[in-house]
Protein backbone atom coordinates (compact mmCIF):
# COMPACT_ATOMS: atom_id res chain seq x y z
CA UNK A 1 0.00 0.00 0.00
CA UNK A 2 1.27 3.47 -0.88
CA UNK A 3 2.00 5.75 2.07
CA UNK A 4 -0.33 8.70 2.62
CA UNK A 5 2.44 10.69 4.26
CA UNK A 6 3.94 13.75 2.57
CA UNK A 7 7.06 12.55 0.69
CA UNK A 8 10.11 14.35 2.09
CA UNK A 9 13.44 14.15 0.30
CA UNK A 10 16.96 15.48 0.58
CA UNK A 11 19.23 16.98 -2.06
CA UNK A 12 22.30 14.95 -2.94
CA UNK A 13 24.61 17.91 -2.19
CA UNK A 14 23.41 17.94 1.42
CA UNK A 15 24.96 14.51 2.01
CA UNK A 16 28.65 13.50 2.00
CA UNK A 17 30.20 13.68 -1.46
CA UNK A 18 31.09 10.52 -3.37
CA UNK A 19 29.82 8.20 -6.06
CA UNK A 20 28.53 5.28 -3.95
CA UNK A 21 24.77 5.56 -4.22
CA UNK A 22 24.12 2.59 -1.97
CA UNK A 23 25.89 4.38 0.91
CA UNK A 24 24.11 7.65 0.12
CA UNK A 25 20.66 6.06 0.06
CA UNK A 26 21.33 4.10 3.25
CA UNK A 27 22.28 7.34 5.01
CA UNK A 28 19.17 9.08 3.68
CA UNK A 29 17.06 6.22 5.01
CA UNK A 30 18.74 6.46 8.42
CA UNK A 31 17.94 10.18 8.43
CA UNK A 32 14.28 9.46 7.72
CA UNK A 33 13.99 10.62 4.10
CA UNK A 34 11.84 9.03 1.42
CA UNK A 35 13.99 10.00 -1.53
CA UNK A 36 17.18 11.69 -2.73
CA UNK A 37 17.38 14.14 -5.62
CA UNK A 38 20.37 13.61 -7.90
CA UNK A 39 22.47 16.55 -9.07
CA UNK A 40 23.87 16.81 -12.57
CA UNK A 41 25.62 20.17 -12.42
CA UNK A 42 28.17 21.89 -14.66
CA UNK A 43 31.19 20.05 -13.20
CA UNK A 44 32.84 17.40 -15.34
CA UNK A 45 32.50 14.86 -12.53
CA UNK A 46 28.71 15.07 -12.33
CA UNK A 47 28.24 15.52 -16.08
CA UNK A 48 30.09 12.20 -16.50
CA UNK A 49 27.10 10.45 -14.93
CA UNK A 50 25.20 10.95 -18.16
CA UNK A 51 27.75 8.61 -19.78
CA UNK A 52 27.46 5.87 -17.14
CA UNK A 53 27.67 2.31 -18.40
CA UNK A 54 24.75 -0.10 -18.27
CA UNK A 55 26.31 -1.66 -15.15
CA UNK A 56 26.62 1.68 -13.36
CA UNK A 57 22.99 2.50 -14.13
CA UNK A 58 21.88 -0.90 -12.89
CA UNK A 59 23.86 -0.36 -9.66
CA UNK A 60 21.77 2.75 -8.96
CA UNK A 61 18.54 0.88 -9.68
CA UNK A 62 19.72 -1.93 -7.39
CA UNK A 63 20.57 0.53 -4.59
CA UNK A 64 17.05 1.98 -4.79
CA UNK A 65 15.54 -1.51 -4.64
CA UNK A 66 17.74 -2.56 -1.70
CA UNK A 67 17.15 0.53 0.45
CA UNK A 68 13.62 1.50 -0.53
CA UNK A 69 14.83 5.10 -0.87
CA UNK A 70 13.90 6.43 -4.30
CA UNK A 71 15.78 8.68 -6.72
CA UNK A 72 12.75 10.12 -8.54
CA UNK A 73 14.19 13.46 -9.64
CA UNK A 74 17.29 15.08 -11.08
CA UNK A 75 18.38 18.68 -10.61
CA UNK A 76 19.91 19.45 -14.01
CA UNK A 77 21.90 22.66 -13.52
CA UNK A 78 24.53 21.83 -16.15
CA UNK A 79 22.85 24.29 -18.50
CA UNK A 80 24.53 27.15 -16.65
CA UNK A 81 27.68 26.15 -18.53
CA UNK A 82 25.96 24.97 -21.71
CA UNK A 83 22.84 27.16 -21.95
CA UNK A 84 20.03 26.47 -24.39
CA UNK A 85 19.91 30.19 -25.18
CA UNK A 86 23.59 30.50 -26.10
CA UNK A 87 24.39 32.45 -29.26
CA UNK A 88 27.33 30.10 -29.79
CA UNK A 89 25.89 27.26 -31.86
CA UNK A 90 28.44 24.74 -30.57
CA UNK A 91 27.67 25.53 -26.92
CA UNK A 92 23.92 25.37 -27.54
CA UNK A 93 24.32 22.02 -29.32
CA UNK A 94 26.17 20.71 -26.27
CA UNK A 95 23.28 21.92 -24.11
CA UNK A 96 20.77 20.01 -26.22
CA UNK A 97 22.97 16.91 -26.16
CA UNK A 98 23.14 17.12 -22.35
CA UNK A 99 19.35 17.30 -22.32
CA UNK A 100 19.07 14.26 -24.59
CA UNK A 101 21.47 12.28 -22.40
CA UNK A 102 19.70 13.37 -19.20
CA UNK A 103 16.33 12.24 -20.55
CA UNK A 104 17.81 8.89 -21.63
CA UNK A 105 19.46 8.50 -18.22
CA UNK A 106 16.18 9.28 -16.47
CA UNK A 107 14.36 6.75 -18.61
CA UNK A 108 16.97 4.07 -17.81
CA UNK A 109 17.09 4.49 -14.01
CA UNK A 110 13.48 5.45 -13.25
CA UNK A 111 13.86 9.19 -12.69
CA UNK A 112 10.48 10.77 -13.35
CA UNK A 113 11.20 14.49 -13.12
CA UNK A 114 14.12 16.55 -14.42
CA UNK A 115 14.24 19.98 -12.83
CA UNK A 116 15.43 22.57 -15.34
CA UNK A 117 17.37 25.74 -14.60
CA UNK A 118 15.52 28.74 -16.01
CA UNK A 119 18.51 30.53 -17.53
CA UNK A 120 18.56 31.52 -21.21
CA UNK A 121 22.24 32.24 -20.56
CA UNK A 122 24.11 32.49 -17.26
CA UNK A 123 27.68 33.67 -17.82
CA UNK A 124 26.84 35.88 -20.83
CA UNK A 125 24.63 38.92 -21.38
CA UNK A 126 21.01 38.02 -22.15
CA UNK A 127 19.11 39.60 -25.04
CA UNK A 128 16.13 38.95 -27.31
CA UNK A 129 18.09 36.40 -29.33
CA UNK A 130 19.17 34.37 -26.27
CA UNK A 131 15.57 34.29 -25.05
CA UNK A 132 14.32 33.16 -28.47
CA UNK A 133 16.94 30.41 -28.64
CA UNK A 134 16.04 29.35 -25.10
CA UNK A 135 12.35 29.01 -26.01
CA UNK A 136 13.20 26.99 -29.10
CA UNK A 137 15.55 24.81 -27.05
CA UNK A 138 12.83 24.15 -24.51
CA UNK A 139 10.44 23.15 -27.29
CA UNK A 140 12.96 20.66 -28.67
CA UNK A 141 13.68 19.36 -25.16
CA UNK A 142 10.01 18.85 -24.29
CA UNK A 143 9.49 16.97 -27.56
CA UNK A 144 12.29 14.58 -26.51
CA UNK A 145 10.89 14.26 -22.99
CA UNK A 146 7.41 13.49 -24.31
CA UNK A 147 8.67 10.54 -26.29
CA UNK A 148 10.50 9.22 -23.21
CA UNK A 149 7.59 9.90 -20.81
CA UNK A 150 9.87 11.97 -18.57
CA UNK A 151 8.60 15.23 -17.07
CA UNK A 152 10.66 18.40 -17.44
CA UNK A 153 9.87 20.85 -14.64
CA UNK A 154 11.03 24.45 -14.51
CA UNK A 155 12.58 25.76 -11.31
CA UNK A 156 11.73 29.25 -10.06
CA UNK A 157 15.15 30.83 -10.16
CA UNK A 158 17.65 33.29 -8.70
CA UNK A 159 17.48 35.01 -12.11
CA UNK A 160 14.96 37.54 -13.47
CA UNK A 161 13.88 35.51 -16.53
CA UNK A 162 12.25 32.87 -14.33
CA UNK A 163 11.86 34.39 -10.86
CA UNK A 164 8.13 33.79 -10.45
CA UNK A 165 5.58 31.07 -11.04
CA UNK A 166 3.68 33.51 -13.27
CA UNK A 167 6.68 33.77 -15.61
CA UNK A 168 7.18 29.99 -15.67
CA UNK A 169 3.48 29.52 -16.44
CA UNK A 170 4.01 31.67 -19.53
CA UNK A 171 6.41 29.02 -20.82
CA UNK A 172 3.99 26.25 -19.84
CA UNK A 173 1.26 27.89 -21.91
CA UNK A 174 3.68 28.50 -24.79
CA UNK A 175 4.80 24.85 -24.84
CA UNK A 176 1.31 23.50 -24.10
CA UNK A 177 2.64 20.04 -23.26
CA UNK A 178 1.76 17.84 -20.24
CA UNK A 179 5.42 16.79 -19.97
CA UNK A 180 6.43 20.36 -19.05
CA UNK A 181 5.47 21.47 -15.54
CA UNK A 182 6.72 23.59 -12.64
CA UNK A 183 9.12 22.82 -9.78
CA UNK A 184 9.06 25.95 -7.58
CA UNK A 185 11.66 26.78 -4.97
CA UNK A 186 9.88 28.58 -2.14
CA UNK A 187 13.18 30.16 -1.13
CA UNK A 188 13.86 31.70 -4.54
CA UNK A 189 10.21 32.70 -4.86
CA UNK A 190 10.34 34.52 -1.51
CA UNK A 191 13.63 36.34 -2.16
CA UNK A 192 12.09 38.40 -4.96
CA UNK A 193 9.29 40.96 -4.72
CA UNK A 194 6.57 38.35 -5.25
CA UNK A 195 3.18 37.86 -3.61
CA UNK A 196 4.30 34.37 -2.63
CA UNK A 197 0.90 32.97 -1.64
CA UNK A 198 -0.75 34.23 -4.84
CA UNK A 199 2.09 32.79 -6.89
CA UNK A 200 1.72 29.36 -5.26
CA UNK A 201 -2.03 29.46 -5.90
CA UNK A 202 -1.39 30.41 -9.53
CA UNK A 203 0.73 27.29 -9.97
CA UNK A 204 -2.03 24.98 -8.77
CA UNK A 205 -2.32 21.97 -11.04
CA UNK A 206 1.14 22.50 -12.56
CA UNK A 207 3.44 21.95 -9.54
CA UNK A 208 5.09 18.51 -9.53
CA UNK A 209 7.59 19.06 -6.66
CA UNK A 210 8.75 21.80 -4.29
CA UNK A 211 12.25 22.83 -3.20
CA UNK A 212 12.46 23.92 0.45
CA UNK A 213 15.20 26.32 1.55
CA UNK A 214 15.56 29.69 3.26
CA UNK A 215 16.79 32.84 1.50
CA UNK A 216 17.28 36.57 1.88
CA UNK A 217 16.92 39.21 -0.84
CA UNK A 218 19.96 38.70 -3.07
CA UNK A 219 21.15 35.65 -1.08
CA UNK A 220 19.90 32.39 -2.58
CA UNK A 221 22.17 29.74 -1.01
CA UNK A 222 23.40 28.64 2.40
CA UNK A 223 20.98 30.71 4.48
CA UNK A 224 20.31 28.67 7.67
CA UNK A 225 16.67 27.72 8.16
CA UNK A 226 14.92 30.37 10.23
CA UNK A 227 17.38 33.15 9.42
CA UNK A 228 15.86 34.23 6.10
CA UNK A 229 12.62 35.74 4.82
CA UNK A 230 10.65 32.62 3.87
CA UNK A 231 7.31 32.21 5.66
CA UNK A 232 7.41 28.42 5.58
CA UNK A 233 4.23 27.83 7.54
CA UNK A 234 2.14 30.01 5.21
CA UNK A 235 3.74 28.47 2.12
CA UNK A 236 2.96 24.96 3.34
CA UNK A 237 -0.60 25.97 4.25
CA UNK A 238 -1.17 27.53 0.83
CA UNK A 239 0.17 24.50 -1.01
CA UNK A 240 -1.97 22.19 1.09
CA UNK A 241 -5.10 24.30 0.50
CA UNK A 242 -4.40 24.38 -3.24
CA UNK A 243 -4.58 20.58 -3.30
CA UNK A 244 -0.86 19.92 -3.71
CA UNK A 245 0.02 16.47 -2.33
CA UNK A 246 3.40 15.93 -3.98
CA UNK A 247 6.98 15.75 -2.72
CA UNK A 248 9.01 18.34 -0.82
CA UNK A 249 12.80 18.42 -1.18
CA UNK A 250 15.08 20.03 1.41
CA UNK A 251 17.79 21.78 -0.60
CA UNK A 252 21.11 22.19 1.19
CA UNK A 253 24.80 22.31 0.27
CA UNK A 254 26.32 20.68 3.36
CA UNK A 255 28.29 17.91 1.58
CA UNK A 256 31.59 19.52 2.62
CA UNK A 257 30.50 20.33 6.19
CA UNK A 258 32.32 18.77 9.13
CA UNK A 259 29.26 16.63 9.90
CA UNK A 260 26.79 16.72 6.99
CA UNK A 261 24.42 14.20 8.60
CA UNK A 262 24.05 16.34 11.73
CA UNK A 263 23.38 19.46 9.63
CA UNK A 264 20.75 17.60 7.63
CA UNK A 265 19.06 16.15 10.72
CA UNK A 266 18.82 19.63 12.24
CA UNK A 267 17.26 21.03 9.05
CA UNK A 268 14.89 18.06 8.77
CA UNK A 269 13.56 18.60 12.29
CA UNK A 270 13.16 22.34 11.68
CA UNK A 271 11.23 21.85 8.43
CA UNK A 272 9.03 19.07 9.82
CA UNK A 273 8.10 21.28 12.78
CA UNK A 274 6.85 23.96 10.35
CA UNK A 275 5.00 21.32 8.35
CA UNK A 276 3.33 20.16 11.56
CA UNK A 277 2.23 23.72 12.36
CA UNK A 278 0.74 23.90 8.86
CA UNK A 279 -1.21 20.70 9.53
CA UNK A 280 0.74 18.65 6.97
CA UNK A 281 2.44 16.14 9.26
CA UNK A 282 2.01 15.03 12.84
CA UNK A 283 4.13 16.89 15.38
CA UNK A 284 7.17 14.96 16.56
From Swiss-Prot:
One of the Pfam families matching this protein, by short name: AP_endonuc_2
Stated EC number for the protein is 5.1.3.22
Q: In which pathway does it act?
A: Cofactor degradation; L-ascorbate degradation; D-xylulose 5-phosphate from L-ascorbate: step 3/4
Q: What induces it?
A: Induced by L-ascorbate. Repressed by UlaR.
Q: Which UniProt keywords apply?
A: Isomerase
Cited InterPro entries: L-Ru-5P_3-Epase (IPR004560), L-Ru-5P_3-Epase_Enterobacteria (IPR023492), Sugar_Epim/Isomerase (IPR050417), Xyl_isomerase-like_sf (IPR036237), Xyl_isomerase-like_TIM-brl (IPR013022)
Q: Respond yes or no to whether keyword Isomerase is given for this record.
A: yes
* Catalysis: reaction(s): L-ribulose 5-phosphate = L-xylulose 5-phosphate
Q: What GO molecular-function term can you cite, just one?
A: intramolecular oxidoreductase activity, interconverting aldoses and ketoses
The Gene Ontology biological process terms listed for this entry are: L-ascorbic acid catabolic process
Q: NCBIfam families in the record, alphabetically?
A: hxl6Piso_put, PRK13209.1, PRK13210.1
Indicate the family of this protein.
Belongs to the L-ribulose-5-phosphate 3-epimerase family.
Q: What does this protein do?
A: Catalyzes the isomerization of L-xylulose-5-phosphate to L-ribulose-5-phosphate. Is involved in the anaerobic L-ascorbate utilization.
This chain's protein is named L-ribulose-5-phosphate 3-epimerase UlaE
Give the originating organism: Salmonella paratyphi A (strain AKU_12601)
